[in-house]
Each structure stands twice: as structure tokens, then as C-alpha cells.
Amino acid sequence: MAPSKDKKPKKAWSFTLDLTHPVEDGIFDSVNFEQFLKERIKVNGKTGNLGSIVHIGRLKSKITVSSEKKFSKRYLKYLTKKYLKKNNLRDWLRVVASDKETYELRYFQISQDDESESEE
């Protein structure tokens, strides 16, 4: 008789992208970005092959990507930066990790001191 193998519960990988500030300002389209992710995320080396392995959900200005297989948070950042570059938003927005499972889009900080000195 073969020894029984203990099946470990599958770990679900889940990451969140917080797009609150750019969406409220009207410079970022979350619906378009969600579609971009669905088309570009690779599963088993093929794009557009999400199937039942990867799920992408959108709730107002937050996008959640959950996967049954191992999924890299860094890959999500790479795709976000690629989208920003494609839509000429890379000069104004950056992708920042706000915690272990969340990325946030923030504006670059432009110092006001430099501008006020040059005006005087």
C-alpha cells in the first residue's frame, strides 16, 4: 500500500493596487488598466491565459489580483510601470509599495522651495 501524502492547503497569492489619487484627479482610467492587466499577465508563459488561475477584480479605485499559483508582486509592478509609460504618465506617477501586499500610485514630490527662489 502506498503511503498517503498530506495535501497542504493551497496558498492564494493576492495583491492590491491602490489607484485612488490619480483616479480621483481624472488622469488615470482604472477600467482601461484592468483590461491591460487581463491582456498582459502571463500564466505558464502565455499572455491572455488567465483561466481560473488568476483573478482580477476592480472596486472603484482599487484593483485586486489574486492567483492560485505563485505570483510575483514585482511582476505586477513591472506591468503597472509599463502601462504608465505607454500612456505617458510615467513622468508624473510612481509605483510605491505601501505594505507587503499593496502597491500605491503616488505623484512625484516636486519641491516648492526651488520654484519660489527662482521667481524672486
Swiss-Prot record:
Belongs to the eukaryotic ribosomal protein eL22 family. Keywords: Ribonucleoprotein, Ribosomal protein. Disulfide bonds: none annotated. It comes from the Eukaryota. Gene3D superfamilies: 3.30.1360.210. GO terms for biological process: translation. InterPro entries: Ribosomal_eL22, Ribosomal_eL22_sf. It comes from Xenopus tropicalis. The gene is rpl22l1. GO terms for cellular component: ribonucleoprotein complex; ribosome. The keyword Ribosomal protein applies. It holds the Pfam family Ribosomal_L22e. GO terms for molecular function: structural constituent of ribosome. This is Ribosomal protein eL22-like 1. The keyword Transmembrane helix does not apply.
